[in-house]
Amino acid sequence: MIRIIAIVVLFFLQCQADLPPVMKGLEENKVTGVWYGIAAASNCKQFLQMKSDNMPAPVNIYSLNNGHMKSSTSFQTEKGCQQMDVEMTTVEKGHYKWKMQQGDSETIIVATDYDAFLMEFTKIQMGAEVCVTVKLFGRKDTLPEDKIKHFEDHIEKVGLKKEQYIRFHTKATCVPK
């Protein structure tokens, strides 16, 4: 029985070890507001199928709602502007859980200076498959090259490849309501 408990605990710790740490000293209230998509990298099949050089940038708005973070994301599709709203449960400031149709998700804010950039890590557990997406946002629709280089270095550290990376060149045309 003790052996089974030890295996379960080790499995749980391994699952948690796959997540990067939340940015130290994160001030959640300073994260709220509008963020423009600058770049993203993902091993998700759906992302890789949709990825193109002229993929329009998403716009994300973070807001606090009864102590939980809400994410409203809008993006342009062939059918016009689409919006996805997600109410996330706070695990700790900067670490959130939420459910998707595809599986359980966790989002972590790994870096931000609050005024210019924000880097977000999302992990989706879809059965046995793990889907990882890292996104770079800016308060404006452009960022200095050093911030983009930092993001490109970070995606390699979490096991993503250059082929799984996209830099949004088309400016955002949809803003969440």
Swiss-Prot record:
It is found in: Secreted. Keywords: Disulfide bond, Olfaction, Secreted, Sensory transduction, Signal. Belongs to the calycin superfamily. Lipocalin family. Gene3D superfamilies: 2.40.128.20. Residues 1-17 form the signal peptide. This is Olfactory protein. One of its GO terms (biological process) is sensory perception of smell. Pfam families: Lipocalin (PF00061). PROSITE patterns: LIPOCALIN. Coiled coil: none annotated. GO terms for cellular component: extracellular region. GO terms for molecular function: small molecule binding. Transmembrane segments: none annotated. Disulfide bonds join 81-174.
